[in-house]
């Protein structure tokens, strides 16, 4: 009996101590206003795990869609949170009348910027873009169907070679078109698909400086208005007290050094938010660029 009582007392003490330890941790949940599959779900869980490693009490709150997320934000749950949103998602939310206002208080910091790339087939000889274009009067460029026809006009003016867009639905089909020899070049997001496809050679990115030995587009095409464009995601604040905002912003920026997030960003050469000056301005600029193509 004595042993049983000791075990019960020990268990109660452990439970109480655990509760106190948890209570000492600052709370910062991660809401995910999307399906439980795909990139947003994976990133949300990745971030929550990293926040726990950093010393936060963090849980994933699956709100599933924008309207639910907006309703969650209006409640006093007692648990501050963040969610990650891209410029494209922001525009889509607005178009569906699910308005989640971005202010200086709710825009915490940029999570990352994913860059664009331009590629050729790897079996084609390539030294520089100038040599590749030499002697050509026209080149075709595989790109997503959502881009406007005139996106490459300034490239044509700069190089004297006409860049003609060929539309495809999805990056997988863009690559297929290039590999099949249907186009001379391709222009798309720089993801693990592009990096991992050995039949293509992605020779440049829209990063502001050289990454992975690739000369930046701002050097190859200095007059092109999209030479530094890319997909930007930011952290949006959900009911974070005013006196905690500065600390949360600093901690979110430091997540780029987390043991899981750092390699996640590095494998596709994404630029972490902590390395981006004027993150809000960069995000707003990306929104403007997307809207100008519609």
Language-model segment annotations:
Residues 120-138:
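Flexible hinge/capping segments at coil-to-helix
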Residues 9-18:
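Bacterial N-terminal signal peptides
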Residues 142-153:
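Secondary-structure junction motif
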Residues 22-104, 147-148, 158-187, 192-196, ...:
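N-terminal (or domain-start) structured segment
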Residues 1-9:
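Bacterial N-terminal signal peptides that target proteins for export
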Residues 98-117, 140, 218, 222-225:
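A structural signal for short loop-to-beta-strand junctions that line the ligand-binding cleft
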């Amino acid at each position: 009996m004595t042993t049983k009582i000791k075990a019960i007392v020990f268990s109660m003490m452990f439970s109480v101590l655990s509760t106190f330890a948890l209570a000492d941790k600052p709370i910062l949940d991660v809401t995910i206003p999307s399906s439980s599959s795909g990139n947003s779900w994976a990133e949300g869980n990745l971030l929550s795990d990293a926040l726990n490693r950093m010393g936060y009490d963090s849980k994933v709150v699956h709100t599933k869609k924008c309207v639910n997320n907006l309703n969650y934000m209006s409640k006093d749950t007692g648990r501050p949170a963040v969610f990650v949103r891209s410029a494209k998602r922001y525009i889509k939310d607005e178009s569906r009348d699910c308005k989640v206002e971005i202010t200086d208080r709710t825009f915490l910091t940029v999570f990352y910027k994913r860059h664009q790339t331009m590629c050729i087939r790897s079996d084609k000889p390539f030294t520089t873009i100038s040599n590749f274009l030499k002697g050509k009067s026209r080149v075709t460029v595989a790109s997503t169907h959502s881009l406007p026809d005139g996106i490459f006009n300034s490239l044509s003016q700069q190089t004297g070679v006409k860049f003609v867009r060929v539309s495809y639905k999805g990056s997988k089909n863009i690559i297929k078109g290039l590999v099949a020899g249907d186009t001379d070049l391709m222009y798309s997001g720089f993801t693990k698909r592009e990096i991992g496809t050995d039949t293509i050679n992605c020779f440049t990115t829209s990063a502001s400086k050289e990454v992975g030995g690739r000369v930046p587009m701002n050097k190859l095409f200095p007059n092109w208005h999209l030479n530094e464009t890319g997909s930007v995601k930011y952290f949006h604040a959900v009911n974070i007290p005013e006196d905690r905002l500065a600390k949360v912003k600093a901690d979110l920026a430091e997540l780029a050094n987390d043991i899981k997030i750092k390699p996640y960003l590095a494998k596709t050469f994404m630029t972490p938010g902590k390395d981006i000056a004027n993150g809000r301005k960069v995000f707003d600029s990306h929104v403007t660029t997307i809207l100008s193509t519609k």
